[in-house]
Amino acid sequence: GLDLFYANWNFYGKMNYKKYQELGENPKFIKSDPEFFRIYVDFKTRKREVKEKSGLKGIDLRKEKFLQSHIGKQQIMNADGVGVTEQKRFQNMINVVKIAPNKDSTQLLNLMNVKYVISMKHIASPDYELVHSYIPIPKDPEERKKFENSTHVKIYENKKVIPRAFLVPNCRVITSDKQYNDVLQSKIFDPTRVVLLDVEPKGFPCGEEKNLEILNPVTIDSYKSNSVELSVDSSKRQLLFMSESFYPGWKVYVNGEEKEILRANYLFRAIVVEPGKHSVRFEYDPFSFKLGLAITILTILLCGIYFIRRSLRRVAPVEKFSLANK
């Protein structure tokens, strides 16, 4: 057991709690944006250790890079990160983003509602604009160019970001992972016009020509870890796409009536909505939690009964003895 005592010796450091919770300059900028969106920290930026000319290092540099251990309480939504358990489909999609030659090579970051990309490397794309860094961005064109090519942690805004939830007029059935991989890696795929589904929805034929309209936004009324409430106003029968993971245990209610959740675009959720105004509520209500709760309560009751009966057995002989002596 002595080896366990020395495990991770000097691995966990200590510092002032208030200083640990202070926001860096980059997180302050992200927090100032009131919209619903996610960030994405470039994989090489997350892993890379650099010597900053500004002298920034340690925890201060980690804050500016939005490393996972520093963004939890800041309520900044990250499209990637380190989790105890991860869905295979999610990991597959993130891997496509990581190996893509450029950030705009696919529609995946747009699809994941990524508005800002954190990167040390310059993103040379008309779809991305350098908007912030913890070091002031030079206004002089030549100095700005040098800054873009530096190793400073920079924030790029994605001009093609797609909303967290929106209405889509058409769908396409995909029957294999290879098909998904081919389509999702293609820049031609437009998630605002067509939703990729595993199966065709009842009463909603995929592939039929439908009148294409401009992107139909959806209002997010409430957003919590275990529930999301939306307001939808659709001019016709469409698919409501939600850039959230498809996962067992999630249920959806349209105007209080439970509906089917479809797996959409390989990883996310979609439902069919009728014309008109609707109140939509996604709710995490897994059977496994209810089963676990029932087992826990039953176990507590059985243990309580056991200990009560055991205590009564110990008291009984004493009572008999006292009565006999009276």
Residue spans of the language-model regions?
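Conserved luminal/periplasmic juxtamembrane motif of membrane-embedded glycan-processing enzymes
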Residues: G1-N216, Y223-E229, R237, F241-S245, ...
